[in-house]
Amino acid sequence: MPNTRQAKKRMRRDAKRRLRNRYHLSRMRTYIKNFRRMIENGEIDKAKEYINEVISVIYHTAAKGVIHKNEAARRASRVYKLLNKALQQQQAQA
């Protein structure tokens, strides 16, 4: 339990920020999860259209300070890597 006014205020502020951060993290993870599902289900054309939204959400989350910019770059890289791998497999089958 906080003892000072400042500590009480900090707790209130942290609670608000925690909620906001959880929203952005959850949103980002959902977009990535949906993208992975598209790849797994073979919906590569949909995934190609959806990737711009996914990358945008990832970098937006970093801009809000929820994740570090290097983490955003790493996540974006992994998303692109998934798409490129799926595209290569699709071309190999054709």
UniProtKB/Swiss-Prot annotation:
Binds directly to 16S ribosomal RNA. InterPro entries: Ribosomal_bS20, Ribosomal_bS20_sf. Gene3D superfamilies: Ribosomal protein S20. This is Small ribosomal subunit protein bS20. GO terms for molecular function: small ribosomal subunit rRNA binding; structural constituent of ribosome. One of its GO terms (biological process) is translation. It comes from Aquifex aeolicus (strain VF5). GO terms for cellular component: cytosol; small ribosomal subunit. Keywords: Ribonucleoprotein, Ribosomal protein, RNA-binding, rRNA-binding.
